[in-house]
Amino acid sequence: WCHNPELIENEQQLIVSPSNCIGCGHCVEVCSAHAISFGDAGVSIDRSRCTVCLACADGCFANALRPVARLMTVGEVLAEVEKDKGFYDNTGGGLTVSGGEVLAHAEFAGALIDAAAARGISSCVDTSGFGSSRALLDLVSRPGVTDVLFDIKAVDDEVHREFVGVSVGPVLANVRLL
């Protein structure tokens, strides 16, 4: 997912693609919050009413409504990862923890890395480097971590501020730390 802004929030989110809507009305029927309506542009959601229960997305065969993220436990994520264990074993690959920004979810990522390592799956930490140095060191020093990817958007502070909105200073400090 590579530092996608829609994955930074710690909650489920719903994406609307009105052009995919076939007008079946199923989403309106199953929405107990009465947050979905149809207009000239297709389906739309009143975000102030939506509870993000995902009942509408579960029944949307046209993918006009779909979850962009959902809350999962370490066990649920690991169950998905383990489906590809044979591939990892044959290629030397493993789990890549990213985000949003992995440092924003360091405690969860650490628990996932540990659980994967206990099952013989190595991990790679993929980060923009913008986060806690302590969290970064904690993650990359775990026994299951074999690789670290740093996605540095720009090394010039002015350019970084223009495109990312923050100074590159903390990012470069974290790179030097490793």
Where are the regions that the model predicts?
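Iron-sulfur cluster-binding cysteine motifs and their immediate structural context
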Residues: 1-10, 26-45, 55-70
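Glycine-rich, flexible loop/turn motifs
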Residues: 11-12, 68, 84, 159
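Pocket-edge positions in alpha/beta enzyme catalytic cores
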Residues: 13, 19, 42, 66-69, ...
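Thr-Gly-centered strand-to-loop micro-motif
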Residues: 16-18, 45-46, 98-99, 127
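Cysteine-rich micro-motifs
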Residues: 19, 47-54
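Mature, well-folded catalytic/scaffold domains that follow N-terminal targeting or propeptide regions
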Residues: 21-24
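FAD-binding FR-type
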Residues: 49, 70-76
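Conserved AdoMet/S-adenosylmethionine-binding subsite of the radical SAM
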Residues: 75-178
